[in-house]
Structure formats: structure tokens, C-alpha cells
Amino acid sequence: MGACGKSVEKTYIQSINQARKSDVRITIEHQGDKLISTDSVSTVYYKEAGVSKDEIKNIIANYDAEFKDVKGYSHSAEYKDEYFVEKTTIDYTKAELKVLQEKKLITAQKSSKIDYISYESILKSFKSIGFKEVKNGKFEELK
């Protein structure tokens, strides 16, 4: 596998939009190219996102119902007056990758049997949708 003997490292990435008042922070743990876990914290303001508090509660309740039995996956949301904070963790050492694939929590070619998730490919994927790497976990704050 090549990951043996290597220490677990953390990479921090962020997608922040001051105008839309949304902030997504992801901490990626990996050992070599093998992904260990992803931990994301999203802060989104209702008004700027164009949704009400009740609408987002319904969306997240449906999401939670669909994914509640997925091993290695945890999710929570905290609702404030003007915004909500959503936390999602996927522990790839506990999860069944086939189930994550079926639930579209990870992407891989349908026919491919996967043994692990590549850190390099997931980082490239996040960067392709606008995430930027953050040094030492020093995230930009919403203003």
C-alpha cells in the first residue's frame, strides 16, 4: 500500500464567499496518499443563501434520514437566528467504501472496486470546485 510507516498528516482547505456569507472548512487527514478522514464545518447565512431556517431544517432532516445508517459517517447541524452551522465527518477507516459510493458521498467509476480513497485525487477534486489550501489551519473568517 505504501502508507505503512508514514505519519498521519492534516491538510486544511476552505471555500469562502463573503458576498454570499458562506464558509466551508474541511480538514483532511491522510497517510501518504490514503485518505483517513474528512471533517467539514459549513457556516451558511439563510438570507444570502435564499433559504429560510425551516427550509434548511427540512433539507437537513431528509439528508440525515438518508445517511443515518452509514458506518463511519456523522453529521450534525446547529441552527442560529441568521445562519446555521453544519458539521460532517467521514472516517474512511470505519466506512464501507462501496456504501459511500452508492450513497454518492464519494465518487468513483461505477465499475471500479475501490480499496481506499486517494488523498491527491480528492484534493484535486476540491480545488477544481474552488477550494483553496489553508496553511496551519488559519482559516479566513466571514466578515
Predicted feature residues:
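C-terminal motif of bacterial Sec signal peptides marking the signal peptidase cleavage site
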Residues: G2-A3
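Subset-of-secretome marker
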Residues: S7-K143
